[in-house]
């Protein structure tokens, strides 16, 4: 019944597209008039649009004309005219939705339409891509259109200094990777002045390969971290012990990706730990004094039994590097958290890095929800439409192709074993290679791609391998995968974002030419060669895409299929499966095995049947549903931290903006003074119960007050009067500091101390939340909801953090001291600038710019500063140097800067 109604009235997607096509006629009707404009007149349209917006017009009022202007600019500058379906894609993006467009339909060009329109507001547009190569490529190619129309373009890639980043973010349109955007957001909220920040307020983002970023990477938080205690020796010892365990000592669930010791395993490991003197002979692993070891044992078990080298990670240059399970790329700078990375390093016998403590973190889910307007584009999103709507409130609209898809998707073939499957794949590759048909073979891991590569090497079939080990060459290799007789093995969707053109990609070949020798002649030669090869490839049947396994997600399979049949080109796709494949073995083996027994599977024979395809699809849907629930659950927990993060970041910004820091100082002074007095002199208590001795000690510890016991000696004195006296004494201490150091210095110092103290307690709070999060699931055994428990305890920890902030801040302010022995009063206001400079330099350390900062960002909260005339310094006596700026030449006479000489270890 439902299918009949769909045929009669069309789907909701069909109706949306039909409505959008009616709007395209308005853009097309403007084209003749726009084409008559001179280059200068076309460029002036940008000024005209901005003026209209200033006078109250909305973006929707100018959308059709703006799109017509961009289309004409693209035609003149790049020789590319937007098709009607591309205009539809642009309207979808402008309206804050996701557009699904097939591979090769020109998504990069589509983004220019909403990017230009929304940049006219002057608030900036972020075009987000998955890697530095695509960000650089798109900003260079599409930037010509924006520049022609008078807009500025910026590009953000890893390793850029802040000055260049700031300029790029201030451009009208900025191309950047999702990683750099997220980390810059975290770094900005660790800086000490608004001028040091690089990002502008959030406005509008267009995410390319939106499914990869918002779905595949949603469970991977961005983390800036610093080292904690060195436990590398313990990881090494536990690793050796775990290697001695038997298969019966633990149970693992590959579906849930969990592993636990059995009763015999616990007994076995306790005896091994006891022999190594790691635990006492009369104690058990789960005794209170040994509980911390459980964490190390569990991570070692996971490292050895749940993670495989060249599948989940690879070892390069003595380092364990994570492989992205969806793209096959190495995730540079990323480390597993909670000690898992250290366990893998112990397993692979490489240097064990220190565990890291989180200093700042955010998930992509919460980062991208900061944008008031968000949109995205991809070739595959409809299968994830419910999740994108539920979590990000983004609707998905599938746009029809410009040319009809002529690609033929063949039925899957299933074999009893991996060897039989590889034999069948090899036979097909040989057949295609002999007639010159290009082949792209998709694998799910580096290990599988290298297995297949070795098979092809034995058969002497020339081929290229594209996986995480050859990341730098991936765009070039994938671009040439459509050439005559080309055989390319690719890990999943490595090279995504680069089109495979039949006959080859001329632009990339031209880029490699030597421009000094016969450049024009060589260009003509390349173009002629590619045109000839394209004819040969089309005659051979176009690109043949072979899948060596089904992925857990149907979307990833669809992406692989979408590599073939670009813009109406011919092509074929086929998946080869075996009962040994992970998806079949873990999720579908029983159901499929029953079907195969019914159909009668024999050695060396393949079965292809619609029933198998349906069973596989159900298995994939089951996994997708499980992964969706995991992402949703992660978001529920991360939302708790996100609410707290927003409060802290907003407060931090307010502190930086504030011109008067005394308000918080005075209110906190009064609050703490009252709290301390009431602690030692409770309301309604007798005088003889007052603890004056400890009151004096506490007031000195917090406020540096020397409390006079005589104040309490009066018979009629009350707690309220003593509180007022204490507050006045604290104010007097502060005033004396202002007189000694100047009010400007004290204002800046108070702000500086408040920020550094806030950073310190927030860092400690994140550490506490990490530990709380790790163990909270165990509350379910006590019939308690882990999420509710986490919310309650996280709130209590947050309140505790705020109390710690107040006390640490007040204590530091009132104990703050500058040695004036060698400092002129008129120079003292410069001392704060030196403190700020030192703070800035500590954050300019190269390690800080990495995803996992290698240096702790803890700040010295006892800034004692003195300056000495350089003439009075004895080069041989460092004690006579006083305070030396880190960028000054070292007083020892070495000729080096102080920070690289005697100051290197400060």
From Swiss-Prot:
Binding site for ATP: 86, 104-108, 499
Compartments it resides in: Cell inner membrane; Cytoplasm
Entry membrane topology: Peripheral membrane protein
Free-text comment on the cofactor: May bind 1 zinc ion per subunit.
Pfam hit, one: SecA_DEAD
Keyword set, alphabetical order: ATP-binding, Cell inner membrane, Cell membrane, Cytoplasm, Membrane, Metal-binding, Nucleotide-binding, Protein transport, Translocase, Translocation, Transport, Zinc
GO cellular component: cell envelope Sec protein transport complex; cytosol; plasma membrane
SMART domains associated with the record: SecA_DEAD (SM00957), SecA_PP_bind (SM00958)
Gene Ontology terms: biological process: intracellular protein transmembrane transport; protein import; protein targeting; protein transport by the Sec complex
Matches recorded under InterPro entries: Helicase_ATP-bd, P-loop_NTPase, SEC_C_motif, SecA, SecA_CS, SecA_DEAD, SecA_motor_DEAD, SecA_preprotein_X-link_dom
GO molecular function: ATP binding; metal ion binding; protein-exporting ATPase activity
Catalytic activity: ATP + H2O + cellular proteinSide 1 = ADP + phosphate + cellular proteinSide 2
Alphabetical list of HAMAP family matching this protein: SecA (MF_01382)
Subunit structure: Monomer and homodimer. Part of the essential Sec protein translocation apparatus which comprises SecA, SecYEG and auxiliary proteins SecDF-YajC and YidC.
Name used for this protein in its record: Protein translocase subunit SecA
Source organism of this protein record: Rickettsia massiliae (strain Mtu5)
Gene responsible for this protein: secA
């Amino acid at each position: 019944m439902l299918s009949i109604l769909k045929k009669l009235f069309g789907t909701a997607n069909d109706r949306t597209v039909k409505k959008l096509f009616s709007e395209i006629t308005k853009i097309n009707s403007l084209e003749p008039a726009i084409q008559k404009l001179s280059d200068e007149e076309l460029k002036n349209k940008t000024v005209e649009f901005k003026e209209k917006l200033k006078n109250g017009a909305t973006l929707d009022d100018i959308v059709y004309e703006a799109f017509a202007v961009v289309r004409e600019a693209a035609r003149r500058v790049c020789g590319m005219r937007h098709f009607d379906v591309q205009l539809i894609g642009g309207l979808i993006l402008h309206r804050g939705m996701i557009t699904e467009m097939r591979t090769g339909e020109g998504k990069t060009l589509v983004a220019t339409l909403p990017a230009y329109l929304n940049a006219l507001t002057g608030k900036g547009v972020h075009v987000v891509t998955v890697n530095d190569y695509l960000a650089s490529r798109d900003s260079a190619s599409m930037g010509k259109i924006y520049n022609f129309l008078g807009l500025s373009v910026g590009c953000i890639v890893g390793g850029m200094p802040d000055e260049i980043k700031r300029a790029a973010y201030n451009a009208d349109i900025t191309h950047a990777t999702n990683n750099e955007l997220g980390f810059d957001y975290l770094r900005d909220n660790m800086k000490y002045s608004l001028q040091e920040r690089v990002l502008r307020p959030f406005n509008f983002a267009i995410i390319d390969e939106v499914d990869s970023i918002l779905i595949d990477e949603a469970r991977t938080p961005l983390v800036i971290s610093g080292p904690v205690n060195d436990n590398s020796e313990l990881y090494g010892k536990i690793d050796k012990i775990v290697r001695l365990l038997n298969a019966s000592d633990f149970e693992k669930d590959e579906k849930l990706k969990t592993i636990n010791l059995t009763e015999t395993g616990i007994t076995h490991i306790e005896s091994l730990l006891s022999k190594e003197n790691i635990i006492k002979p009369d104690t058990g692993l789960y005794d209170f004094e040994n509980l911390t070891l459980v964490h190390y044992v569990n991570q070692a078990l996971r490292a050895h039994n749940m993670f495989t080298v060249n599948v989940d990670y690879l070892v390069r240059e003595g380092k364990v590097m994570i492989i992205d399970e969806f793209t096959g790329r190495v995730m540079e700078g990323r480390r597993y958290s909670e000690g898992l990375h250290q366990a893998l390093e112990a397993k692979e016998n490489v240097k064990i890095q220190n565990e890291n403590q989180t200093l700042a973190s955010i998930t992509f889910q919460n980062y991208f929800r900061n944008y008031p307007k968000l949109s995205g584009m991809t070739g595959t999103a409809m299968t994830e439409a419910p999740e994108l709507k539920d979590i990000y409130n983004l609707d998905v609209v599938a746009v029809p192709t410009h040319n009809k898809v002529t690609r033929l998707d063949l039925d899957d073939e299933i074999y009893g074993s991996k060897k039989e499957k590889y034999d069948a794949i090899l036979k097909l590759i040989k057949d295609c290679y002999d007639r010159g048909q290009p082949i792209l073979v998709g694998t799910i891991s580096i290990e599988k791609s290298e297995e297949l590569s070795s098979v092809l090497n034995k058969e002497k079939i020339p081929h290229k391998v594209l996986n995480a080990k050859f990341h730098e060459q991936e765009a070039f290799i994938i671009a040439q995968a459509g050439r005559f007789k080309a055989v390319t093995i690719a890990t999943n969707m490595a090279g995504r974002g680069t089109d495979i053109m039949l006959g080859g990609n001329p632009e990339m070949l031209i880029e490699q030419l030597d421009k000094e020798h016969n450049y024009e002649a060589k260009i003509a030669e390349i173009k002629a060669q590619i045109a000839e090869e394209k004819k040969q490839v089309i005659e051979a049947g176009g690109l043949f895409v072979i899948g060596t396994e089904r992925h857990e997600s149907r979307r990833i399979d669809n992406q692989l299929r979408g590599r073939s049949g670009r813009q109406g080109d011919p092509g074929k796709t086929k998946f080869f499966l075996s009962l040994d494949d992970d998806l079949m073995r873990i999720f579908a083996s029983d159901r499929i095995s029953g079907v195969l027994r019914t159909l009668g599977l024999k050695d060396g024979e393949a079965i292809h049947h619609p029933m198998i395809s349906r069973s596989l699809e159900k298995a994939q849907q089951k996994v997708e549903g499980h992964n969706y629930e995991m992402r949703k659950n992660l978001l529920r927990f991360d939302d708790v931290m996100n609410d707290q993060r927003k409060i802290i970041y907003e407060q931090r910004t307010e502190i930086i903006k504030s011109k008067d820091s005394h308000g918080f100082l005075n209110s906190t002074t009064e609050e703490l003074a009252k709290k301390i007095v009431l602690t030692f002199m409770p309301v309604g208590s007798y005088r003889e119960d007052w603890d004056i001795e400890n009151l004096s000690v506490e007031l000195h510890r917090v406020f540096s007050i020397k409390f006079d016991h005589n104040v309490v000696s009066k018979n009629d004195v009350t707690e309220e009067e003593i509180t007022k006296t204490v507050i006045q004494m604290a104010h007097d201490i502060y005033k004396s500091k202002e007189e000694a150091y100047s009010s400007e210095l004290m204002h800046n110092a108070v702000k500086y101390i408040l920020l550094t103290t806030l950073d310190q307690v927030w860092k400690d709070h994140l550490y506490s939340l990490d530990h709380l999060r790790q163990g909270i699931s165990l509350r379910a055994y006590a019939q308690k909801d882990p999420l509710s428990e986490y919310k309650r305890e996280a709130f209590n920890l947050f309140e505790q953090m705020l109390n710690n902030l107040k006390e640490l801040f007040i204590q530091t302010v009132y104990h703050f001291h500058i040695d004036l022995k060698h400092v002129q009063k008129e120079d003292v206001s410069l001392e704060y600038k030196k403190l700020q400079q030192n703070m800035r330099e500590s954050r300019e350390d190269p390690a800080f710019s990495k995803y996992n900062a290698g240096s702790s960002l803890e700040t010295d909260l006892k800034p004692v500063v003195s300056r000495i005339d350089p003439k009075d310094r004895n080069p041989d006596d460092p004690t006579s140097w006083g305070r030396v700026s880190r960028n000054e030449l070292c007083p020892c006479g070495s000729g080096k800067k102080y920070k690289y000489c005697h100051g290197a270890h400060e």
